Amino acid sequence: MMSHAVCRLLMAVSVVLFGQATRAAEPPAARPQLPLRLAAPVRPKQLPLSPPSPPFRYTEATHGAGSLKYVGEIPVFTLQGTPEQIGEQTAVLAKEVLPPLLETPKRIIQQFGLNYDLLRPIATAAATSMIGHSPERFRAEMDSLAKYTNADASLLYVANSLTELRRIGGCSAFLVTPDRTATGEMMFGRNFDFPTFGVLDRYSCVMIVRPEGKHAFASIAVPGLTGVISGMNDAGLALATLDVYASRDGSSMFDMNGAPLALTYRQMLEECETVEEARALLEKTPRTTWMNLACCDRNRAVIFEITPKKVGVRDPEGDILRCTNHFMLPDLAVGVRCERFKTLGHLVDFKAGEKFTLEEVHRCMHSVHQSELTFQTMIFEPASLKVHVAFGPGPCTQKPLQVIELADRFAGK
């Protein structure tokens, strides 16, 4: 248990990070809405940007039961076995990128003018405490990764636990239920909008993870992120997290007595098959902060509106579900001013009940990109176990999507 003084100091730090980012994230002035096409973007938030990253290509390799291969321009890791084996495979296959990636928490803290050396021991103590609320296997995987990277494991604890402190992301999600898609199956579009700090866009990848005795899943991430921020498992359960900046329920913005949400989301993919099972796990796990979680299985789509106090469930508006960076449920919402949310609504109106193709979902995601911040975009198809992805310097929504067929990969074929 951490001392009250340490808790107060960490909370003060979180308020500094949260306050600056919230001011940066004020929505832009209203602009005319555009029809469903490759439209000009909504003006991006005034968030801290990063210089363009130079091109990078991973070295294809195998290690034990793990491998790193390319599908088109997309690097795909396959990791399997025990937590220790998965950690070792990640460390060896991603050895050239882990050192700069592990510097990212430091860069984020310094971005706000804070003293990293002063805060690191506090952040490490908090992260270690929070990880104690998650399954032990996740810490074992991080410890193994650190061992074979010759890195300090505390860097991984912080990277996977204290992302809840930052509020510098945007992100958008657009889910179309089977009755409104041309294919008759769920489609789940998602943009990940975040400053790249010169590394996140360069090293983005698809990670196919086959944990011993658990559901296999795909995570769209970077090496070293043991938790999940965007992913889908072999049962067709898909999810993606989106920052939230305010809540009406009186809950604290940050509760250190919760489990890191990214690790909880991974646990959901490893242990759950349906939205209802995911909800049950989320409700029984202590939560750290405010967050939206877009989630669907093959038949149902919801937004979990998460606070340390409760888990709200928002259902589709008709056959469509849109989500950005605010709550919508009456007991949680604190005003809706996001232009991206409004743009997605206008695009739905423009379709006037017609069915969406995959290309049109892609165009919807392009219509709400945030310029340099949008360095990952994807569309999940849970029924056919496919993910269509594009990475790279933003806006990556203007790039063609590469399909990754997941069924055989999940089965180890």
Q: Residue spans of the language-model regions?
A:
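Gly/Pro-rich turn-and-neighbor structural signature
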Residues: 145-189
